[in-house]
Amino acid sequence: MIWGIEFLQEAEKDMKRLDHSVQIQVLKGIKKVSKNPLPVSQGGYGKPLGNKENTNLTNLMKIKFRDIGIRMVYKIEYVDGVMKIIVISARTDEQVYKEASKRRKEHNI
């Protein structure tokens, strides 16, 4: 099953800020992850987050694109069969987690 993909408006802006060649690599990665966005413990690609850097990111997943230094945080919407992308960034883990927490609160995710 391929899961649907939704971007928060801010995540779309994150994508647009990336260099075009990086965007292509990230989109390929997102397509691959959408085939199985579940946690690694369930055979998927996502690494579950919890309480990171003084932020509660429980029920969120992360993917690192190591070759290009990009991190992506997303939430699995099981009922809708959608992975909702919250942040895509080249920032450090701490910065990405803080931004994900902020967006989660703003959008009540």
Region annotations inferred by a language model:
Residues 1-32:
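Arg/Lys-rich, positively charged N-terminal/basic patches that mediate binding to nucleic acids
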Residues 5, 42-43, 97:
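Non-catalytic, surface-exposed connector residues within folded enzymatic/regulatory domains
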Residues 34-64:
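A short, surface-exposed loop/turn module that caps and links secondary-structure elements
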Residues 18, 33-37, 107:
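Solvent-exposed amphipathic alpha-helical surface segments
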Residues 21, 52, 63-66, 91:
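Surface-exposed loop/turn and secondary-structure junction residues enriched for glycine/proline
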Residues 13, 58, 65-109:
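Enriched for short, Lys/Arg-rich terminal
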